[in-house]
Structure formats: C-alpha cells, structure tokens
Regions:
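Substrate-binding clefts and catalytic carboxylate motifs of secreted carbohydrate-active enzymes
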Residues: 4-5, 15, 24, 35-205
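Short acidic, flexible loop segments centered on an aromatic residue
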Residues: 203-216
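Repeat-solenoid scaffold signature
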Residues: 1-15, 23-29, 214-216
C-alpha cells in the first residue's frame, strides 16, 4: 500500500479480497467485498442469504454432484453410493457429502436411491444459490453485485460449479441464468407480507409494464 501511495497517490487500492472476513462477521458486510460461506461451512439454511447482505458478494456457493452421465465416466455401477471409495475420491470437501444430505433434509425428502439423490442435490444447489443471487439483486443499490463460486471444473468431481468438467450445465447454471435475467420478478415472504420485487438492468426504462397476479 505504501508503494502504491508513493507512485500513484490518486489510485484506489484495496488490500485483498475479501476485504475483511471470509464469512460470519456482520461488520464485514458493510464495506468492500465479502465472501459468505455460511450456507456451506456454517451449515446455515438458505434463508440466511436473505438477510446477510454485503456491499458486493464476491464468493458464495453450495456443492452438488455432476449429473449421472458424468459420474459414469469415472465410476462403475457398483460404486454408485454416496460414501463409496470412488465417490469419496471425487469429493475433496472434508464433510461435503454430509452437508449436502443435511441441507437437503431441510427442504426435501432425502432419496435412498443414489441417482435420485444426485438429481435432488442438483435441484438443491440451484435453488439455494439462486436465493442468494436474487437477494443481492433485491438489495440494490446497497449491494451492487454478486459472484457465485464457481463456474466450472478442472476434472469430473463433486463441486460448487454450475458447469461440470464436460461442459454439461447443472441445474444451478439454469437458475443463475434466470436470476441474472435483464428483468427479474421476485416474490418473497417477509414477515406476514408477500412482497413483489421487479428488478431491471436495462439501460432504458420500459414505457409500459403490466404485472399480473393470480392467487391459487
């Protein structure tokens, strides 16, 4: 920092990313960028993302297995079990499989069949990360951006990616596409109220907008 100040005193300098804390410290959400691993290492529910809003989210995420077609490239049917030797070799987060099942149990019935477990894990990852993406967009201009961890993989593996090693989109990538759409309509229950948010990243305002609401 001293050298930057000496050579280019008008240049803004940020000493690191994240600016203060990796996750779990509310004071770190007030300045610069933040990493929030509460829904992973902190084992918090996805709803925590609705209130833990940083100025800029530069990293957060949740794991999922790749689809069965990708798993079949490195495992045989006899290896299709969550804690098989082959599956553990392709899971580099120490308690990753435990966290996937634990969080899945908060929202869905945990399937016994491995292929169904993989499928529901993909759904879970997509829904959870999308919840964070939409929360960050809703809180603009306080929060002016969000990046999720991570885009893709360097080998076929259980990971936080939204695209697997072979280029197959996980459910998360489709959910991220929807969450980052130029115009997003988001309904969220806040207390006793159901609030509707309409967010637009268009450079020009739409002259006419119609919102239709159907109660079922």
């Amino acid at each position: 920092p001293r050298k930057v100040a000496e050579l280019d005193p008008d240049r803004f300098y940020m000493h690191g990313s994240p600016y203060e804390a990796n996750w779990g410290r509310p004071e770190s959400w007030k300045i610069a960028d933040s990493h929030n691993w509460g829904i992973w290492y902190g084992q918090k529910p996805f709803e925590s993302l609705d209130t833990e809003i940083p100025r800029f989210m530069s990293e957060f995420g949740f794991q999922a297995f790749p689809e069965m077609k990708t798993i079949a490239t490195f495992a045989s049917p006899e290896d299709y079990a969550l804690e098989s030797e082959v599956m553990n070799a392709h899971q580099k987060a120490t308690i990753g499989n435990f966290l996937i099942k634990k969080t899945m149990g908060l929202y869905y019935k945990v399937p016994e069949d491995f292929d169904q477990l993989v499928y529901m894990g993909l759904v879970l990852q997509g829904v959870g990360v999308r919840q964070g993406l939409e929360a960050h967009r809703r809180n603009r201009p306080y929060c002016m951006g969000t990046l999720y961890w991570q885009l893709n993989d360097s080998w076929p593996v259980v990971s936080w990616s939204s695209i697997d090693y072979y280029g197959n989109w996980k459910a998360l990538h489709y959910q991220a596409k929807r969450a980052f759409a130029p115009v997003l309509v988001d309904a969220i229950k806040e207390g006793e109220d159901l609030n509707i948010y309409v967010m637009s990243d268009k450079l020009e305002a739409d002259k006419e907008v119609t919102l239709g609401l159907r109660v079922m």
